[in-house]
Regions:
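Internal alpha-helical scaffold of NAD(P)-dependent oxidoreductase catalytic cores
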Residues: 1-31, 42-81, 125
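Short pre-catalytic strand/loop immediately N-terminal to key active-site residues, enriched for Gly-Thr
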Residues: 28-34, 85-90
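Catalytic, metal-anchored helix/loop core of enzyme active sites in primary metabolism
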Residues: 35, 47, 132
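Aromatic-residue-lined binding/catalytic grooves and analogous aromatic/hydrophobic interfacial grooves
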Residues: 39
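NAD(P)-dependent Rossmann-like dehydrogenase/reductase catalytic/cofactor-binding core
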Residues: 66-134
Length: 134
């Protein structure tokens, strides 16, 4: 790497003024890009899909958009408290209930695999795009 300790401290100060800074080894930067650099688009796609599903169930688009925006805000606030997402999911999923029925479909459709492959593809693309810099 060509960055000095002073460069790192400057970047941390600038970026830290608008958010949390996590320092990772240079070898992990492509994975970070694939996960959180592309992550907002993954979440926006989930929001789009939920909005489309709500409309397909007969809800008005403007109502659906408001509900899904608030769903993401509320869910993000809960995540920000530091609780494990698995525990949060369990706390809102009653056995045999409506949420459990929906989760079963998502798991059967391999949602975890889809996200893992998306992160892997974005990570690999980051490696390709950055290859000329190494």
């Amino acid at each position: 790497t060509h960055a000095t300790q002073a460069d790192l401290e400057w970047a941390q100060a600038v970026l830290g003024s608008v958010g949390i800074v996590v320092t990772v080894p240079e070898a992990q930067l492509d994975a970070v890009t694939g996960l959180v650099g592309s992550g907002p688009a993954y979440l926006f796609l989930v929001a789009e899909a939920l909005m489309d599903a709500g409309v397909a169930e007969g809800l008005p688009r403007d109502t659906v958009e408001l509900l899904i925006r608030q769903l993401f805000v509320g869910s993000a606030a809960l995540l920000a408290q530091g609780q494990d997402p698995k525990d949060l999911r369990a706390s809102v999923t009653s056995p045999g209930g409506t949420t459990a029925a929906g989760i079963a479909i998502l798991e059967a459709q391999a949602i975890r695999t889809a996200f893992a492959e998306a992160v892997r593809a974005a990570t690999e693309r980051s490696r390709q795009l950055g290859g000329h810099l190494r």
